[in-house]
């Protein structure tokens, strides 16, 4: 009751001293604010109202006033004169540049003053703020460059001072001398370069001091003198060149952070004056030397972090530091661990030794409290039976990115609490299953030799699993219930973020003082119950990683068999007739044969895939990994690319050869020789071999999919993506060259200014090849290119079907075009059958007499004489050479097909040559009949005739037939 009377008396006095017109009701709330009563006092919230000045109608009973996030740039001198009960004033987030001392007069009960996030450049020096009961002052995030000596002299009760994120260049030593009650201060995020001696000599009650994110290079030897109560010191993110030996005077120091500096050495007995140290964060320093006694005899130390000390080769001596619970020594140069590690650190819970060069592990038998071990990115090759024995509390074990090729069958036998195991990126071919039944998280990605199948019975509690192959996820429901890629990536992204935070990371680096593994696991369990309702297994099976069958549908399956059979039979027959026929092998005909050879390889690869599909029908997941990683898949991929590129390059050569032949015949009267065409074909073959060999040396990958071709999907390796794009661009360029070349060829033929007679069968055949191959390649190139670059959504099913059917389809169509529509095939077959029949007759009539042989000799001589005479006649005429005539007039069924629509007027000599050509078949036929009737060896006769034919050279071919 007495307190209430005193308050009312004070209020009445305040009104009596004011002008009558300015009287304010006791509990009136400003119109732009929200008020709440706190007993007889008033809490006023005027934040974020766009105010440009302090409201004038504030109640004198206001105890809390929030004016933050407004547009106030200046405060009137008497704005708070009557607010004697004000205990908290918030002016943050305004545009204040200066606050004079008189503005805060009379606020004797003010305990909290917030002025952060303004534009304060200077503090009052002549008229200091008289705030005797102020406990907390926030001046952070301003533009303060200096704190005058008398500014803080009226705040003798101040306990918390924020001066971070300003423009200070030195410690305000004089201003701090009057703050003997100060308990916490931050000077972080300034431009301080030096801490002088005795900078904090009167701050005997200071417990927390933050000096991080400055430019401090030098510390005075006695700079921390007087800080008898200091427990937390932050010197992180500075430019310290030497270890801060001045910390030895801080007898009560418990938490020390000076990571991200430029300190190169930790001296012997570095922390001898800090026996109560509990946490040391010293990572991201270029440490080259650590004294053996540096971390000895720190019985309270429970967290030690030395990340990034790349020059450390030996494990630090931790004798007497028996309370250590979290030890982090990552990105150092450790080559081994002491065998008595667990005797030295019996309470160790978290051991993080990633990114070192450790090759062998000691036994962790006596580290019974260990809950997390991180040994990723080392050189460990094998895990012995006793390495992790009796670690009943171990929950997380990270052995990823080592060279582990062997794990003892009982290595995990006693790990009953193990729930997370990471073996990513090793060389395992087998995984022991004993002791892994409690796992909820398992990572085996990157162990490409580990192709065995796993079952649900192997991991009954599994929730998240990463396998080397997508086929191994089929048993975990990957085919039926896998989520979309975006949803999976979202969760994986959240897991990566959580790696840096407190919740479900696989192997976090702990920096907090009060680390609680049980709390983390509890949080992890809650998150998993929310996010996961089924087993999440990656990589996710799909059309290019099928679970049941290599081919998704019977249409594709039957189509592949049909393409394979037609290609194998058709191309074999074509090659047989082209290269074994006794008829003249023209350059274009030779190229047609090489194209058929490439198509035969394509048919062989297609048939191999069809056989694999038949062999693994209904259970491809059991064999998919072995097929992908096997030599057979790589061979199929190599031959597929070789055949595909060879076919396109040979087709390009055929188009160019036809065009060049026409041009050369018009200009020089002859076409390129068969030898030059063969050399060009060898060059095309060499280029195809080089392209097909690139994935074998790491540019692309043949085993990325069970189709054994470089993956046409955008989620492949960058090298594979680049290889596929380059392949499509090169093939598209070839088809452009082919199209342009043949347009020019037809333009030249339409002019009709050639003296020679051309056989258009081959020219038309090459044109049909160009049309069909280009027509079939366009959708393949378009869909593959769109899929690789994600130009628009293309389902994997469509891409797979197109690649399987349309890509090898030309290999079956090309030979059919030749076998069904090209007259040269029929003639070559007739010659082959005739020769076979004659060979059979020769075997029956092998008892020829000497007289018969003589008559045969005479006939042969007559035939040679005829050929010689024909040579003389044709050399004097502008008509085709006689041997070419003989070759193509022997079969009377082959017709001369002129390409040009009109010919030049024939001369008498041309008519004479034409008559001779027309009479040649009769002469040769009569001679052959004479030979046959005389019982002469027809094969020898053919050979002699061929010799006579070749005596004049193949150049005549360019003037008559292709």
Swiss-Prot record:
Localization, UniProt: Cell membrane
Keyword Methyltransferase assigned to the entry: answer is no
Question: Per UniProt, what is one Pfam family of this protein?
Answer: LRR_1
Q: Where mainly found?
A: membrane
Q: Which UniProt keywords apply?
A: Cell membrane, Disulfide bond, G-protein coupled receptor, Glycoprotein, Leucine-rich repeat, Membrane, Phosphoprotein, Receptor, Repeat, Signal, Transducer, Transmembrane, Transmembrane helix
| GO terms (BP aspect) | adenylate cyclase-activating G protein-coupled receptor signaling pathway; hormone-mediated signaling pathway
Purpose of the protein: Receptor for R-spondins that potentiates the canonical Wnt signaling pathway. Upon binding to R-spondins (rspo1, rspo2, rspo3 or rspo4), associates with phosphorylated lrp6 and frizzled receptors that are activated by extracellular Wnt receptors, triggering the canonical Wnt signaling pathway to increase expression of target genes. In contrast to classical G-protein coupled receptors, does not activate heterotrimeric G-proteins to transduce the signal.
Report what the protein is called.
Leucine-rich repeat-containing G-protein coupled receptor 6
What's the source species for this entry?
Answer: Danio rerio
